[in-house]
């Protein structure tokens, strides 16, 4: 069986991907929550039996103001992982973000993801970056829209008119697996149908009682709509729309 390393294995997407890879790869998990550190990945790669690294470990969120942590975890750690993968000829699949698109880069988080794409292109050209768009699913990451809705009360800015390509976590995991066999340097992973935040909230409200406060105020660092670079190949999947994805997420 092939062997893969997943960094950020205890995170929202990492846990889902570990389960999905069961039977496909022998998975080595690395996560700071269990004492691991992606920066120290090279000795594992030097053993010569690793087929892939799925690098998901990162400081997340546009609204994250821990700039030193973002620099350390998203930039320096990525440089270490990418250069090690290149040195040992190991396929690198890494999580990028819709915020890496220049039109969407409003924060240090987005800047770090854009840096990763450029660094990989120059120093690990066989890597494939996966631009994830607003991923949601069971056990959502703290601070995301779905998490805030389920743990309300929750303030919805701009009257819920902001537009996103909400993408189900199962589709994101399939795209990461697709990227392992892909020779493209960058791919998009997004539900082709966009929805307003209000539409997403209304769909969640079919399953849970929500405590929402809609305001017309704009949230700093936020974008009305996440622009999609259509010049970047989109992974061909049967993407679930929010009705299907939230049913899988919230149905008991």
Where are these regions (language model features)?
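Conserved cofactor-binding/catalytic machinery of classical short-chain dehydrogenase/reductase
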Residues: 52, 77-80, 91, 115-116, ...
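NAD(P)H-binding glycine-rich loop region in Rossmannoid oxidoreductase-like domains
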Residues: 41-73, 99-103
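C-terminal substrate-binding subdomain of Rossmann-fold SDR/epimerase-dehydratase oxidoreductases
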Residues: 157-252
């Amino acid at each position: 069986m092939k062997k893969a390393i997943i960094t950020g294995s205890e995170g929202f997407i990492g846990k889902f991907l570990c389960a999905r890879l069961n039977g496909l790869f022998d998975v080595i998990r690395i996560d700071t929550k269990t004492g691991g550190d992606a920066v120290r990945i090279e000795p594992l790669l030097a053993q010569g039996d690793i087929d892939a690294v799925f690098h998901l470990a990162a400081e997340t969120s546009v609204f994250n103001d821990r700039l030193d942590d973002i620099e350390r975890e998203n930039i320096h750690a990525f440089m270490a992982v990418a250069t090690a993968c290149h040195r040992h000829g190991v396929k690198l699949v890494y999580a990028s973000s819709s915020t890496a698109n220049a039109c969407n880069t409003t924060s240090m988080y987005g800047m770090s993801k854009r840096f990763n794409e450029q660094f990989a292109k120059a120093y690990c050209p066989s890597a494939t970056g996966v631009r994830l768009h607003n991923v949601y699913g069971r056990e959502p990451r703290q601070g995301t829209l779905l998490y805030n809705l389920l743990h309300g009360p929750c303030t919805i800015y701009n009257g819920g008119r902001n537009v996103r390509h909400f993408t189900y976590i199962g589709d994101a995991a399939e795209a990461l697996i697709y990227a392992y066999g892909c020779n493209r340097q960058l791919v998009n992973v997004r539900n082709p149908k966009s929805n307003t935040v209000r539409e997403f909230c209304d769909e969640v409200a079919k399953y849970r009682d929500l405590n929402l406060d809609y305001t017309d105020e704009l949230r700093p660092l936020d974008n009305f709509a996440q622009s999609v670079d259509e010049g970047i190949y989109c992974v061909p999947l049967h993407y679930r729309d929010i009705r299907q994805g939230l049913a899988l997420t919230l149905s008991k």
